[in-house]
Amino acid sequence: MRLATILSESGRNVATGTSHAVGLALGLAIACGLLSGVDALTVIGLEQDATAYQASAAHVRTVSAPSAVDPDACAALTDSSSVQAAGALVPTEPLIPSATPANPLQAFSVTTSLGRVLGVDAPHPEGVWVSETLAQTLGLSVGGTLGTSDGPLVVAGTFPWPQDGRDSRLGLAVLVPTTVDQRYDECWAAGWPTTGAVDDLLRTVVDVEPQSTEAVTVGQVNTSLGKSFDAHQAFEERPTRFAPWGCAGVGFVLGYWGLRRRRLEHAGARHAGQSRSAQLATASLETAVWAGAGAVVGGSALLVLVTLSGAHDQAAVFRLAAQGVALGALGALLGATVAVSLVRERHLFRYFKDR
């Protein structure tokens, strides 16, 4: 059977509705689109959870050891791939605002590297840092001054510090960046993804005298979202991780059913002299048409879903979701091949009676 004949017969079967291409394509698109869409939304949810975890400063680990934290060692933690930012702080004498002398503000001396941990927006090189909450409460702005009993202080920058479970001390405190060589009380390190290695590294910045009775405490800036967030494990163990294989199964069933229901037609063609290879080629082309169309429709719907979802890495999420519709199309081809391969010419009259 020539290629032109195979192409002509396949096209005729699709055009006349013999292969039920439209219904099978829609079935594949809907089933695989739903399965892959649910998986995509699950992954996007995990991505949003990870973003919220970092935004809440839950990924910031701390070590506390009064007057025993080496600021240089603390800042050097960023040499490790586990830590993206680190800085030290120590409480100092409270500041008395000129406008509200009855309500002193807690103050901290901090290393400049702590700014990256806190997300300080500091366009001015010199001055103090305050939280956005405190700035709003006192009517302060970056570049303005905070009047105190010790004189005016320039507000060099602000940082977000909402009341979401994180260490509340910094919400109404004034942070004074300094380069003075001194020992600090705490070292904060932002590490992502969260691993136990960060805690081990934090302990190395503490220089405790052998006879000291001070406790070294490792903690977390915000404990409200859990001690750790293993994004990789959450992704690998998500309940929808088998969605692509579900799509492959759906495709196989549709491909098999689409050809199995025509076994009388194929057995008759075999009886009339059509070769098995020609029949397989014709069936594969017909299936490729509707499976490809279904994959395109399902993939387009997934693209719209991912685009509208606001996923941080839309390309990666779409590639993951597209695996489902791709496997669905491949499953359909496999199912069709199996169905045609199981047709036997000698069963022609049985197929006729069972039709």
Residue ranges with predicted function:
Residues 1-3, 46-109:
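Membrane-proximal extracellular/periplasmic loop immediately following the first transmembrane helix
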Residues 1-35:
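N-terminal Sec/SRP start-transfer signal
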Residues 11, 32-58, 338-342:
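Alpha-helical transmembrane segments
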Residues 39-40, 244-267, 279:
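A hydrophobic alpha-helix feature that marks transmembrane segments and, especially
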Residues 77-84, 91-226:
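Basic-flanked hydrophobic alpha-helices used for secretion and membrane insertion
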Residues 209-247, 256-260:
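Peri-transmembrane interface segments
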Residues 268-336:
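Transmembrane alpha-helical interface segments in multi-pass membrane proteins
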Residues 327-355:
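C-terminal membrane-exit region of the final transmembrane helix in multipass inner-membrane proteins
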